[in-house]
């Protein structure tokens, strides 16, 4: 039987991604009003254990995956960078083979995407990318779920990304051809998306429009998306903020988007840097629904990976 890893969006078929989102919507509706610790009907992952490895600190990823396993009737074990580091002391491949003997699936939040790929190649259980320097596929599934939940039809929609063409942007680029939306990306030249990701989208016949101003990218967009300008470990933070400041999402920028446009941000947010408080705390913002939907999207991802 083929092992179902969830490392990136682009290798999956559109039908598989659609099925994951449909199940996420259905599971969320099925437990509306329930206590958060109540197990889903049928306990789909009863007896299953997820190992969670964190090389990077986390709030939403850690809590959402742990609660996902609890609600599905399973359990989780967490190891941080203080407990272990991939490739140090023991090879990534050996770690993957050992953990495969103990647990049913592994979620990794890592510094280097290549480590996650090497881990998955050696593992005999499903491996999920919880975030790497290259991509953040679980986040994008939650984002798309949130947009659908608020009435947006993805096919034919125009989404705009402004700021740093980072790992989250990369996963939106991968998702565009799979779900049929176009993506306008507004970044400074030095923070433009990786050419490899643009080539992936081109091969999948996705529409990705690149701009050097936020205003051009946002014009007429149904959704405006931002992310932090400075992440953990970034050097020369002051210079980054200076270069990216013209890409901050303000009320004035949102006025250039389509009527009723929504705002997304995967959090944590820095009000006054990449987004103004009036936007992220205003009526267009879906950020807390987006954060909650990490739980529901990841439950569906776990069930898809484990064939449950």
From Swiss-Prot:
L-ornithine binds at residues 167, 227, 231-232. It comes from the Bacteria. This is Ornithine carbamoyltransferase. Disulfide bonds: none annotated. The lineage of its organism: Bacteria, Pseudomonadati, Pseudomonadota, Alphaproteobacteria, Hyphomonadales. Belongs to the aspartate/ornithine carbamoyltransferase superfamily. OTCase family. Reversibly catalyzes the transfer of the carbamoyl group from carbamoyl phosphate (CP) to the N(epsilon) atom of ornithine (ORN) to produce L-citrulline. One of its GO terms (molecular function) is ornithine carbamoyltransferase activity. NCBIfam families: orni_carb_tr, PRK00779.1. GO terms for cellular component: cytoplasm. GO terms for biological process: arginine biosynthetic process via ornithine; citrulline biosynthetic process; L-arginine biosynthetic process. SUPFAM superfamilies: Aspartate/ornithine carbamoyltransferase. InterPro entries: Asp/Orn_carbamoyltranf_P-bd, Asp/Orn_carbamoylTrfase, Asp/Orn_carbamoylTrfase_sf, Asp_carbamoyltransf_Asp/Orn-bd, Orn/put_carbamltrans, OTCase_ArgI. The gene is argF. It holds the Pfam family OTCace. Keywords: Amino-acid biosynthesis, Arginine biosynthesis, Cytoplasm, Transferase. Pathway: Amino-acid biosynthesis; L-arginine biosynthesis; L-arginine from L-ornithine and carbamoyl phosphate: step 1/3. It is found in: Cytoplasm. Its EC number is 2.1.3.3. It catalyses: carbamoyl phosphate + L-ornithine = L-citrulline + phosphate + H(+). Carbamoyl phosphate binds at residues 58-61, 85, 109, 136-139, 266-267, 294.
């Amino acid at each position: 039987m083929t092992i179902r890893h969830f490392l990136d969006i682009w290798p999956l078929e559109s039908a598989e991604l659609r099925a994951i989102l449909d199940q996420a919507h259905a599971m969320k509706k099925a437990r509306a009003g329930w206590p958060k610790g109540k197990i889903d009907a049928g306990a789909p992952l009863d007896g299953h254990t997820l190992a969670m490895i964190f090389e990077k600190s986390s709030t939403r990823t850690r809590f959402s995956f742990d609660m996902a396993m609890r609600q599905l009737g399973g359990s989780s074990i967490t190891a941080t960078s203080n407990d272990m580091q991939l490739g140090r002391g023991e090879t990534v491949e050996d770690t993957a083979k050992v953990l495969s003997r103990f647990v049913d699936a592994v979620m990794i939040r890592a510094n280097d995407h290549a480590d996650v790929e090497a881990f998955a190649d050696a593992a005999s259980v499903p491996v999920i990318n919880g975030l790497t320097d290259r991509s953040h596929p679980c986040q994008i599934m939650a984002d798309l779920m949130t947009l659908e939940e608020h009435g947006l039809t993805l096919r034919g929609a125009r989404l705009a990304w402004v700021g740093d063409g980072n790992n989250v942007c990369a996963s939106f680029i991968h998702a565009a051809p799979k779900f049929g939306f176009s993506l306008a990306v507004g970044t400074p030249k030095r923070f433009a998306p990786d050419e490899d990701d643009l080539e992936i989208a081109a091969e999948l016949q996705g529409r990705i429009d690149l701009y050097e101003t936020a205003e051009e990218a946002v014009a007429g967009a149904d959704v405006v998306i931002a992310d932090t300008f400075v992440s953990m470990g970034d050097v020369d933070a002051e210079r980054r903020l200076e270069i990216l400041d013209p890409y901050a999402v303000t009320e004035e920028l949102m006025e250039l988007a389509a009527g009723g446009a929504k705002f997304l941000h995967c959090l944590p947010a820095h009000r006054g840097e990449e987004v103004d408080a009036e936007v992220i705390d205003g009526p267009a913002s879906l950020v807390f629904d987006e954060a909650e939907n990490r739980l529901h999207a990841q439950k569906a991802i776990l069930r898809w990976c484990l064939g449950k």
